[in-house]
Amino acid sequence: MMPFSVLQVKRLQLELITPAKPTLQETKFLSDIDDQEGLRFQVPVIMCYKDNPSLNKNCNPVKVIREALSRALVYYYPLAGRLKEGPNRKLMVDCNGEGILFVEASADVTLEQLGDKILPPCPLLEEFLFNFPGSDGIIGCPLLLVQVTCLTCGGFILALRVNHTMCDAPGLLLFLTAIAEMARGAHAPSILPVWERELLFSRDPPRITCVHHEYEDVIDHSDGSYASSNQSNMVQRSFYFGAKEMRVLRKQIPPHVISTCSTFDLITACLSKCRTLALKINPKQAVRVSCVVNARGKHHNVRLPLRYYGNAFAFPTAVSKAEPLCKNPLGYALELVKKAKATMNEEYLRSVADLLVLRGRPQYSSTGSYLIVSDNTRAGFGDVNFGWGQPVFAGPAKALDLISFYVQHKNNTEDGILVPMCLPSSAMERFQQELERITQEPKEDICNNLRSTRIMSMM
């Protein structure tokens, strides 16, 4: 395929999309999980679609999605409002129907020419999701920005940015599914959303009943190379975990342990160890890795409606000194991850809400020795069909400082998991070297395989 030299994206005037029908004018409180400091940011998501004339001949994706957005906002009308802050930093949404931001764009490039540049960390994100001045705040700003960019091949890219205080990944998926159903001609969403944020208010009186390492004040004893405030120092790359990498990692774990661990657990243990080595963290420093655990469903005993689209998760945290994490076999890190995840239940989530209220809605720990991982491989973004079939890729567009998202990705002929990482430039090369070392097949195994691949970094 012919590569493109300079991408030219033409944008039309920014619009405000309002609900298609009048909606309630009211004020709704966010939950005490929603409005914590650590969720007061915007999350970028990118979704890429091929042309599919057999399904949607002569249809304009911009027109279809614009109209579907407006109709879906009738049911998700709080997203068309604006946040305001009350006493004790309590967030609430003014459901005033002002609307979400929408922009139509076109680019002189095909999806094939873009290739891996649509994958996280998407180097063209600023072109496909332009940051309009003043649009990325938390209080008093639009809660959603959507840009639909039509490509010369007939395909298109839908990129969006959502205020994380309003919804998590499953909640956003409910909204996107509603838009997709409307785009395909439905009169109403198949799943009608519920607000009910009071279900995750703090208790009266609030009481902290669990240990929450994720919100502890931490003194950073590292060499200072990880300075998240200095974004010029940070670089992003994505790393692919396919069948070969997972096979090598599993061989390093005792049989009685591997039988009860998930792919997520194993990758998280691997990343935690390699990242700690790459950052050269002080051996006596406590290292933390938090796993975002969804509270929905029967597994964690949290009674929430399936139609709930607010934030319904916690990040239980594994803690270890850097020295044993680096020196012990991979199984040590794996056991830490499994034990941390096992602490998640309804009591844990209630205790988080109470802690946040009692301590003024604090930020989670933000030192370089801390990593947050979120499994989006089953979030369902790849099933969102606006009438052009399933997306070529759909998911978070990049890592966010300390946060890495696991996304499903097909590399050549196999399905695997892509993990974007954000690290200081000085540590990124060491991280890749450690990752290649820990996922390298022993020589005797390589001889037994016709083909061997290594960890792939995607710039």
From Swiss-Prot:
Q: Which residues lie in coiled coils?
A: none
Question: Which GO BP terms sit in this record?
Answer: alcohol metabolic process; fruit ripening, climacteric
Q: Which GO terms describe its molecular function?
A: acyltransferase activity
Please provide the record's keywords in A-Z order.
Transferase
What positions does UniProt annotate as the active site of this protein? 164, 385
Q: Listed disulfide bonds for this chain?
A: none
Which InterPro entries does this UniProt record tie to the protein? CAT-like_dom_sf, Plant_acyltransferase
Identify the enzyme class. transferase
Is Transferase one of the keywords UniProt gives this record? yes
**The protein's role, per its UniProt record:** Involved in the biosynthesis of volatile esters which confer ripe apple fruit flavor. Alcohol acyl transferase that can use a wide range of alcohols as substrate to produce esters.
Full protein name: Alcohol acyl transferase 1 allele RGc
Q: Organism source for this protein? A: Malus domestica
Gene name of the encoded protein: AAT1RGC
